[in-house]
Amino acid sequence: MKVVAQEEIAPAIFELVLEGEMVEAMRAGQFLHLRVPDDAHLLRRPISISSIDKANKQCHLIYRIDGAGTAIFSTLSQGDTLDVMGPQGNGFDLSDLDEQNQVLLVGGGIGVPPLLEVAKELHERGVKVVTVLGFANKDAVILKTELAQYGQVFVTTDDGSYGIKGNVSVVINDLDSQFDAVYSCGAPGMMKYINQTFDDHPRAYLSLESRMACGMGACYACVLKVPENETVSQRVCEDGPVFRTGTVVL
C-alpha cells in the first residue's frame, strides 16, 4: 500500500494514512499486518484500522512507537510503500442497529483508534453513541474531538490532568442508561473489567491486543483459553481480535 500522509498526533503516537485496493474489503475492528521495511525485523506488526474511506481507497492507522519496528514506521512519508497483509480478523458486528438503539463505546490508550470507525458507521445509521475513554494523562489523550462528532464523550485520566480522575469504571458505573450493544478496546485491565461488567450482555464485545507472529492462525502464538474448557483455545489473529464478553479467559 502507498503512504499518503503521516503525522505525530501525541507524544510517540502517529497517524498513518495508506491507500490501496485493499481498503474495499476492510471492516470496522479489523487490523493490518505490516512488514517493517528493513531486513532486520522478520515479524510483521499488527496495527488496527482506525478509519476507512472506501471512496478514496484510503485507511487510517494510529499506532504508538513501542520498539525499533514501529520507530521505523514513524519515518515513512508520502509516496513510500508498505508491504501489507490484510485486512485480517473478524471485526465488530454492527448489524441490526439503527436509530432506535443506544450503544456504548469504551476505549483506553492506543486501544481507542479502532472505535472511531465504529462510531462513524453507527452515527450514520442514527444510532445514539456514548463513548468513554481512558488515558494515563492529558498528553496521551487522542481522538476525543473526532469521536465527539458522533455522540457524547467522557474522558478519564489516571492522574486527573484531563477530564475525570480515575479509570473508565468511574464513569461506566454511574451511567444509568441501558445499552443495546457495547464495543471496547484497551489494555488488559480494562478488558477484564468490561468482560466482568458485561459478562451476560448479549452484544458486548472485546477487541483484544496481542503479540502475533504469523498473523494467520498457524503458529498459535496469540491463543486464549475458553471458559470451562481447557482443551479449546481461540486465536486472537484468526478467531478475533473481537470476542463476545464471557467467551474467552482474560
Swiss-Prot record:
Record-listed FAD binding positions: 45-48, 62-64, 69-70
Q: Which CDD domains match?
A: DHOD_e_trans
The entry lists its GO molecular-function terms as:
2 iron, 2 sulfur cluster binding; electron transfer activity; flavin adenine dinucleotide binding; metal ion binding; oxidoreductase activity
Is Transferase one of the keywords UniProt gives this record? no
Sorted alphabetically, which Pfam families does this protein's record hold?
DHODB_Fe-S_bind (PF10418), FAD_binding_6 (PF00970), NAD_binding_1 (PF00175)
Q: Which InterPro entries match?
A: Cbr1-like_FAD-bd_dom (IPR008333), Cyt_c3_hydrogenase_gsu (IPR012165), Dihydroorotate_DH_ele_sf (IPR037117), Dihydroorotate_DH_Fe-S-bd (IPR019480), Dihydroorotate_DHASE_ETsu (IPR023455), FAD-bd_FR_type (IPR017927), FNR_nucleotide-bd (IPR039261), OxRdtase_FAD/NAD-bd (IPR001433)
Keywords noted in UniProt: 2Fe-2S, Electron transport, FAD, Flavoprotein, Iron, Iron-sulfur, Metal-binding, Pyrimidine biosynthesis, Transport
Q: How is the cofactor bound?
A: Binds 1 [2Fe-2S] cluster per subunit.
**So which domain of life are we looking at?**
Bacteria
Q: Which cofactor does it need?
A: [2Fe-2S] cluster; FAD
Which residue numbers delimit the FAD-binding FR-type domain? 1-94
Q: In which pathway does it act?
A: Pyrimidine metabolism; UMP biosynthesis via de novo pathway; orotate from (S)-dihydroorotate (NAD(+) route): step 1/1
Binding of [2Fe-2S] cluster: at which residues? Answer: 214, 219, 222, 237
Q: Name one GO biological process term.
A: 'de novo' UMP biosynthetic process
Q: Where are the transmembrane segments?
A: none
Q: Which family does it belong to?
A: Belongs to the PyrK family.
Q: What PANTHER family does the entry give? A: DIHYDROOROTATE DEHYDROGENASE B (NAD(+)), ELECTRON TRANSFER SUBUNIT (PTHR43513), DIHYDROOROTATE DEHYDROGENASE B (NAD(+)), ELECTRON TRANSFER SUBUNIT-RELATED (PTHR43513:SF3)
Q: What does this protein do?
A: Responsible for channeling the electrons from the oxidation of dihydroorotate from the FMN redox center in the PyrD type B subunit to the ultimate electron acceptor NAD(+).
Q: What does the record note on quaternary structure? A: Heterotetramer of 2 PyrK and 2 PyrD type B subunits.
What name is this protein filed under?
A: Dihydroorotate dehydrogenase B (NAD(+)), electron transfer subunit
- Organismal lineage: Bacteria, Bacillati, Bacillota, Bacilli, Lactobacillales
Report which gene this protein is encoded by.
Answer: pyrK
